[in-house]
UniProtKB/Swiss-Prot annotation:
Family: Belongs to the cystatin family.
GO terms of molecular function: cysteine-type endopeptidase inhibitor activity
Gene encoding the protein: Crp2
Induction statement: By androgens.
Tissue expression per record: Prostate.
Name of this protein: Cystatin-related protein 2
Length: 176
């Protein structure tokens, strides 16, 4: 009986040590888990920014509809200050000879507000569908699409921005 009791106590002591070791390991991994969670949230924020951009582009552009642009097809930078170069054209996006349009160059200096981020999104030359085709997927008829050169858009969400209220936003695109 003495051997059984010692064996049981030994097993119990090993079990308690194992529990303590597991708890210490859990404490040690908690920091990296929080960092991972933070990175995950940032990735979700980028997706949210992309969705907002797509919505704003479709709402404020006059003749075209942005469709089927995947996350990999644009780059985004966040800048807090500096001058923004805005390019205007006399041609409408619907014009067939878009590449030969003459551009007017303007410089726009936007006053920065603390806590306001401006998102710059560069779209490579890609196909846009006309808005009347917005319910159709993939712009099915080639003659109803247009190929644009690289386009740079920026938008600014103000601190009082609420998800469903897109009134406090500044949005602009230009083509290079």
């Amino acid at each position: 009986m003495y051997k059984t009791l010692c064996g049981t106590q030994l097993l119990l002591a090993i079990f308690v040590l194992f529990l303590n070791f597991s708890h210490a390991t859990a404490k040690g991994t908690r920091g990296p888990m929080e960092i991972f969670k933070k990175n995950f949230m940032e990735k979700n924020k980028l997706n949210d920014v992309y969705d907002i951009f797509k919505f704003l582009y479709n709402k404020f552009s006059h003749d075209t509809y942005l469709s089927n642009i995947k996350n990999q097809s644009f780059t985004m930078n966040t800048w807090g200050f500096g001058e923004i170069e805005v390019v205007k054209t006399k041609c409408r996006k619907i014009d067939s000879d878009f590449y030969k349009c003459s551009f007017q160059w303007e410089f726009c200096n936007i006053k920065r507000t603390p806590g306001v981020t401006i998102y710059y999104i560069t779209l490579p030359g890609s196909v846009r569908c006309r808005k009347l085709l917005s319910k159709l997927v993939n712009c099915p008829f080639e003659e109803q699409t247009e190929q644009l050169k690289r386009e740079i858009c920026y938008f600014q969400l103000y601190p009082d921005y609420i998800e469903q209220n897109i009134r406090s936003v500044r949005f602009n695109c230009y083509t290079k």
